[in-house]
């Protein structure tokens, strides 16, 4: 691409993005490519079904960019995957170059190259999902098919989808891979219906080696006739040919209430794994990894403070670091203290769910009352079985129900260090998963505290 062609195309994209909603831009413009500008004609490669949208909505954009760069009216010649090779054969060196064609893969995977297994932080809450994803990437279509990953927003489902795709692509650069949200699958279905080009949609999705569908619950929300039918047929075509399918959702297959039963049944053919919010240790590990992207010093107490402020998902942690970076750059600060971090994230905390301020003393009192021990005994060093349990439950609840840092909590329990609090928290958390009676006890205490 010449310098003028690059300037022209960048201007087209800039103008399009300023005029379209982000979702519309991503769907209709993101995958388009400029091949060349010759004799005042811009040759643009895109999906055939999107040509009508470009003609109707982006003609003025191309005209504007053309006059700005070439001082001429630029016409457009749209080419598609199936006719690009034909044009090249007819035009030889005067037409499209081999290099240009190679830059246009048979399938636009839409994978994000920054996501890999290497930079995904593992913890107890996502260990099985990671293991299953790696197994699928190593032997697609044979191990778990489909793989269904569910969990709340911001927990790493999209990261794992892309990591699977990038891993497969690394081993087999010719693999036909497609990452797409269920919402965009629906959008493509609608466009193909309107253009009467459903055969193209079938060709595109039913000949894949790996299909990665994000937020499949969006498919359940749609009542458009034929959408679920088309996905059902796509699923069957791929599965029958031992092609790997990976799906993510914010709920289990059984809770996709508006989805046809036959789809739900197929989603459960393979393996279903859950990702839950990261525990404190994992949040610390995530932050320790993320701060390497910033040119600031983060002392350990600051990292632990931040890990204690956001416990619902990874996006909150990433957003907090961006807030801190903004404040630190403005103040020209190199070392991020707890006070600086607290100032930087104040607005984010105010925008988020409000946490009722609960004194640790109140937690200790309610736990002691429930287990028949005194607050003094909870804070002391005595290690009889009933006191140790009460002490660890109180530490667990102090971590769960307040935004105090681990060192602060330890100080309220007789001056214990943060590692003792962390050990107690993890121990009780693990016990809750195995002991239903303990879980009920802790819920009872929490209700009394609230």
Swiss-Prot record:
GO CC field: cytoplasm; plasma membrane
Chain positions covered by the region annotation Domain IV, binds dsDNA: 329-450
Q: Where in the cell is it found?
A: Cytoplasm
Question: Which residue ranges does the record annotate as region Domain III, AAA+ region?
Answer: 110-328
> Which biological process, per GO, is one annotated for this protein?
regulation of DNA replication
Matching entries from Pfam families are given as: Bac_DnaA (PF00308), Bac_DnaA_C (PF08299)
Assembly, in brief, is: Oligomerizes as a right-handed, spiral filament on DNA at oriC.
- The main place the protein resides is cytoplasm
Q: Which InterPro entries match?
A: AAA+_ATPase (IPR003593), Chromosome_initiator_DnaA (IPR001957), Chromosome_initiator_DnaA-like (IPR020591), Chromosome_initiator_DnaA_CS (IPR018312), DnaA_C (IPR013159), DnaA_dom (IPR013317), P-loop_NTPase (IPR027417), Trp_repressor/repl_initiator (IPR010921)
**What protein name does the entry list?**
Chromosomal replication initiator protein DnaA
User: For binding ATP, which residues are annotated in this chain's numbering?
Assistant: 154, 156-158
Chain positions covered by the region annotation Domain II = 84-109
NCBIfam families associated with the record: DnaA
Give TM segment ranges.
Answer: none
Q: What does this protein do?
A: Plays an essential role in the initiation and regulation of chromosomal replication. ATP-DnaA binds to the origin of replication (oriC) to initiate formation of the DNA replication initiation complex once per cell cycle. Binds the DnaA box (a 9 base pair repeat at the origin) and separates the double-stranded (ds)DNA. Forms a right-handed helical filament on oriC DNA; dsDNA binds to the exterior of the filament while single-stranded (ss)DNA is stabiized in the filament's interior.
Q: Which family does it belong to?
A: Belongs to the DnaA family.
One annotated GO molecular function: lipid binding
Q: Which parts of the sequence are annotated with region: Domain I, interacts with DnaA modulators? A: 1-84
| Comment text on domains | Domain I is involved in oligomerization and binding regulators, domain II is flexibile and of varying length in different bacteria, domain III forms the AAA+ region, while domain IV binds dsDNA.
The alphabetical list of record keywords is: ATP-binding, Cytoplasm, DNA replication, DNA-binding, Lipid-binding, Nucleotide-binding
Q: Which cysteines are joined by disulfide bonds?
A: none
């Amino acid at each position: 691409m010449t310098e003028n062609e690059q300037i022209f195309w960048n201007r087209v994209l800039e103008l399009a993005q300023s005029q379209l909603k982000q979702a519309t831009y991503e769907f209709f413009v993101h995958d388009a490519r400029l091949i060349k500008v010759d004799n005042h004609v811009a040759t643009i490669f895109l999906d055939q079904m999107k040509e009508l949208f470009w003609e109707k909505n982006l003609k003025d954009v191309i005209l504007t960019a053309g006059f700005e760069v070439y001082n001429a009216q630029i016409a457009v010649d749209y080419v598609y995957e199936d006719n690009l090779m034909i044009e090249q054969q007819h035009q030889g060196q005067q037409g499209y170059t081999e290099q240009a064609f190679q830059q246009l893969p048979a399938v636009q995977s839409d994978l994000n190259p920054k996501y890999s297994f290497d930079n995904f932080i593992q913890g107890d809450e996502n260990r099985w999902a990671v293991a299953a994803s790696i197994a699928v990437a190593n032997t697609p279509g044979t191990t778990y098919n489909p793989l269904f990953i569910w969990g709340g927003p911001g927990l790493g489902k999209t990261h794992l989808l892309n990591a699977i795709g990038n891993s497969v692509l690394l081993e087999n650069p010719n693999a036909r891979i497609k990452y797409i949200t269920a919402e965009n699958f629906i959008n493509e279905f609608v466009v193909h219906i309107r253009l009467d080009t459903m055969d193209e949609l079938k060709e595109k999705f039913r000949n894949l080696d790996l299909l990665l569908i994000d937020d499949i619950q969006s498919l359940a929300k749609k009542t458009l006739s034929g959408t679920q039918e088309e996905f059902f047929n796509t699923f069957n075509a791929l599965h029958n040919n031992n092609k790997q399918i990976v799906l993510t959702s914010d709920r289990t297959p059984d809770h996709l209430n508006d989805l046809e039963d036959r789809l739900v049944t197929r989603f459960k053919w393979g393996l279903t794994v859950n990702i839950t919010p990261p525990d404190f240790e994992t949040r610390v590990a995530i932050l320790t990894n993320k701060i390497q992207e910033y040119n600031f010093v983060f002392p350990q107490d600051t990292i632990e403070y931040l890990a204690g402020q956001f416990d619902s998902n990874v996006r909150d942690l990433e957003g907090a670091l961006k807030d801190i970076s903004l404040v630190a750059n403005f103040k020209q600060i190199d070392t991020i203290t707890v006070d600086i971090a607290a100032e930087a994230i104040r607005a984010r905390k105010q925008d988020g769910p409000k946490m009722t301020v609960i004194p640790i003393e109140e937690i200790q009192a309610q736990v002691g009352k429930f287990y028949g021990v005194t607050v003094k005994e909870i804070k002391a060093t005595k290690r009889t079985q009933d006191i140790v349990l009460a002490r660890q439950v109180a530490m667990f609840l102090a971590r769960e129900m307040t935004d105090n840092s681990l060192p602060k909590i330890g100080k309220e329990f007789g001056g214990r260090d943060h590692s003792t609090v962390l050990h107690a928290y993890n121990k009780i958390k693990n016990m809750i998963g195995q002991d239903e009676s303990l879980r009920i006890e802790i819920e009872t205490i929490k209700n009394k505290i609230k």
